[in-house]
Amino acid sequence: MTRKTRRLWIVIACLACVGSAAALTLRAFSSNIVFFMAPSQVKANPPSPDRTIRLGGMVMAGSLHRINENGTPVNAFEVTDGQAAVEVHYTGILPDLFREGQSVVALGTVQKDGGFTASEVLAKHDETYMPKEVADELKRTGKWDPRFGKAPDASSWDTMTAKKAGG
């Protein structure tokens, strides 16, 4: 075996090792990736029930109510992006800053009936905060254009959404 051939085999072996390591790393990370989806995306293309996602949008005014499922108190509310709404069921104490008309991100799974069961609910932390994913989705769907000022406040945004949903 010549020196050139030996060097070529060493390079090929190194590339194979690096490629294998990269493939194993990506495979390990892919099972931990949690995708962000807006309600309109969930309605149009529901993920499989075993897939955990982050659902983001605004809590519709008047949608928060407490129900009883199998003897357990559950918070039920609707999350909307202005185009569609998804009902969310969450067993647990809602964050102190959770309000109707405010942005929220819920971590959980979409059920076969189209509802969403959340294992965690995150609310905004002050009056100017909006999760980046929610702001990006509002911009993408045309609900908010930064050229025309800041994002709509919760009450006017929710009023716009209620008119669209009702009419």
Curated annotation (Swiss-Prot):
Gene Ontology biological process terms from the UniProt entry: cytochrome complex assembly
UniProt-annotated stretches for the region Disordered: 141-167
Main location (coarse class): membrane
Record has Nucleus as a keyword: no
Keyword field contains Oxidoreductase: no
Bias (Basic and acidic residues): 141-150
Gene3D superfamilies for this protein: Nucleic acid-binding proteins (2.40.50.140)
A GO cellular-component term linked to this record: plasma membrane
Sorted UniProt keywords: Cell inner membrane, Cell membrane, Cytochrome c-type biogenesis, Heme, Iron, Membrane, Metal-binding, Signal-anchor, Transmembrane, Transmembrane helix
UniProt membrane topology term: Single-pass type II membrane protein
Subcellular location: Cell inner membrane
Periplasmic side: 29-167
Family: Belongs to the CcmE/CycJ family.
Function: Heme chaperone required for the biogenesis of c-type cytochromes. Transiently binds heme delivered by CcmC and transfers the heme to apo-cytochromes in a process facilitated by CcmF and CcmH.
Protein's name according to its UniProt entry: Cytochrome c-type biogenesis protein CcmE
